[in-house]
Curated annotation (Swiss-Prot):
GO terms for molecular function: 4-(cytidine 5'-diphospho)-2-C-methyl-D-erythritol kinase activity; ATP binding. This is 4-diphosphocytidyl-2-C-methyl-D-erythritol kinase. Pathway: Isoprenoid biosynthesis; isopentenyl diphosphate biosynthesis via DXP pathway; isopentenyl diphosphate from 1-deoxy-D-xylulose 5-phosphate: step 3/6. Coiled coil: none annotated. Gene3D superfamilies: 3.30.230.10, GHMP kinase, C-terminal domain. It comes from Agrobacterium fabrum (strain C58 / ATCC 33970) (Agrobacterium tumefaciens (strain C58)). Catalyzes the phosphorylation of the position 2 hydroxy group of 4-diphosphocytidyl-2C-methyl-D-erythritol. PANTHER family: 4-DIPHOSPHOCYTIDYL-2-C-METHYL-D-ERYTHRITOL KINASE, CHLOROPLASTIC.
Length: 299
């Protein structure tokens, strides 16, 4: 999957890959209330898309299967327009022009579903606008802007396998995570992230081990992942029992590892091949026609 491309002379296209928390350990809580996390993250070919064109004035529009769930009103509430504005202000402080743009979001991922949709869209907007405006910004400054938009935005800015610690600002790239075939599954019901954290009984849990990955094959990674967990899954499932139903369905289809991503409600099942994942997607769509299922690969 190519993260970005230029379509024609005036349109910049930037992919916003889905973020998958293969493991998520809650290891503490700061005095300001933010929870400390350690998470192993990868990204998939499935995702949203950002398209940018020059315009007389700024504008923003949304399409896609989940576009109706978001407002295109340019009020600053959407992370895409917030990313545009915060980047423009940062560039203005260094004397770099940032001309008006029309930004179009193709919303292919379920909204508020634990796979970083909004954060990925914001990160893609930052990447795309820097290319569209032919602008430059120091990496640490860009990371700081991303963190202001949300804890997941810095990792989505990278859009590559990584381990993130703290509230998401401490990122360690992973160079040898193999390609994984998986099915993403969501019952298309919302689950409250704040309520999940309120119901989390243990705020200090065992740390995520640092994988010693030199020479690991896919089986080594799967063994490692099997020993990890998502600490948010039990309270999320208590709030939304369909999460347990999803994981059961994925297991029945032959997934070798099943887990919830982020704070849910999206779950993933890893399969031994993409063909197996596609077959599982077809079967699951028949079993639960009103739910979201998508076979994809990691990038």
């Amino acid at each position: 999957m190519r993260l970005h491309e230029v379509s024609g002379a005036t349109e910049t296209v930037e992919a916003a890959p889905a973020k998958i928390n293969l493991a998520l350990h809650v290891t503490g809580q700061r005095a300001d209330g933010y929870h400390l996390l350690e998470t192993l993250v990868t990204f998939t070919a499935a995702g949203d898309m950002i398209r940018i064109r020059d315009a007389a004035t700024d504008s923003f529009s949304i399409s896609g299967p989940f576009g109706d769930l978001l407002s295109a009103g340019d009020s600053g509430d959407n992370l895409v327009t917030r990313a545009r504005d915060i980047l423009r202000d940062a560039l203005a402080s260094t004397g770099q022009p940032a001309r008006p743009v029309d930004i179009h979001l193709e919303k292919n991922l379920p909204v508020a579903s634990g796979i970083g949709g909004g954060s990925a869209d914001a990160a893609a907007t930052l990447r795309g606008l820097l290319r569209h405006w032919d602008a430059a910004i120091a990496p640490e400054k860009l990371k700081s802007l991303a963190l202001k938009l949300g804890a997941d935005v810095p990792m989505c800015l990278a859009s590559r396998p990584l381990i993130a610690r703290g509230i998401g600002e401490d990122i360690e790239a992973l160079t040898d995570l193999p390609e994984l075939s998986m099915v993403l599954a969501n019952p298309l019901k919302a689950v409250s992230t704040p309520e999940i954290f309120r119901r989390l009984q243990n705020k200090v849990n065992p740390h995520l081990p640092t994988p010693s990955t030199i020479g690991w094959a896919t089986t080594g990674w799967m063994d490692f992942l099997a020993q990890s967990r998502n600490d948010l899954q039990p309270p999320a499932q208590a709030l939304l029992p369909e999460i347990g139903e999803i994981t059961g369905l994925l297991s029945e289809e032959g997934a070798t590892l099943v887990r919830m991503s982020g704070s849910g409600a999206t779950c993933f099942g890893i399969f031994h091949s993409f063909d197996a994942a596609k077959n599982a997607e077809t079967s699951l769509r028949k079993k639960r026609p009103g739910w979201y299922f998508h076979a994809t690969r990691t990038i």
